[in-house]
Amino acid sequence: MALSAAIILAAGEGTRMRSNKPKVLHTLAGKTFLNRVMDSVAALDPDTLAVVVHYQAERVAEAARSYNEHVTIVDQDDIPGTGRAVQCAMAQLTQKDDLDGAVLIAASDMPLLDTDTLDQLLAFHEKSGNGATVLTTILDDPTGYGRIIRDSEGNVLRIVEQKDANSSELAVREVNTSVYVFDAKLLAEAIANLKSNNAQGEFYLTDALEAAKANGAVALSPPPTR
């Protein structure tokens, strides 16, 4: 299917790594996390490849540009959250073009994310006729991850972050991988009115799934692998 844009989120500091280096610039087998994700995403041939930066923005932007001169750099402002990162990206990308197609969103700290997985996700999104699709997995220990909450028919109702989850939600082992596909126009509508009324005071991209459902779109994910 036509991939209008791919947005890689690389604005975070990565405080849990306790490093002066941005998390996405740490390396695996000689290549940065960011560059590995860029490789996997670029192989899908999106019309636009964007990288959102904030923490040590120039350093991360230079790493992205030196690796792929065609990348579009998006500066996230001081408003925190993945939802805000995508708001900034969409605002910049739609200044140039009227996006019409799919938009892939991926975190930059997933160096083992491969093109085949992304290709299958896009195919699932298209075949299912989804307005929004999220890649999930099941973990024995889901601590720290956003939990996938489904209805009785298996549709994704919402994603609840660890700090906002109640006891029953914390027991869910299916988690968000932070990889999504949205129809471009739906994404623009879904992120327009995100709120920060959560435990971390951030604009969550995960809330866009609930907004998508409110707009009549179906939010699904491929069947969990375990």
Task: Please name every model-derived segment.
Residues T27, L112, V181:
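Short aromatic/basic micro-patch
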Residues A2-A5, K31-D119, A123:
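Conserved N-terminal catalytic core of the sugar/cofactor nucleotidyltransferase
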Residues I7-A11, T27, V37:
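A conserved hydrophobic helix/loop-capping motif in glycosyltransferases and polysaccharide synthases
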Residues M1-S19, L49:
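N-terminal nucleotide-binding beta1-loop-alpha1 segment
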Residues P46, D98-D100, G129-A132, A217:
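Short, high-confidence coil segments that cap the C-terminus of an alpha-helix
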Residues V156-R226:
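Catalytic-core segments of class I nucleotidyltransferases/pyrophosphorylases
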Residues T137-S168:
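Rossmann-like NAD(P)H-binding beta-loop-alpha module
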Residues D116-T143:
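Conserved donor-nucleotide/metal-binding helix-loop-beta segment in metal-dependent transferases, i.e.
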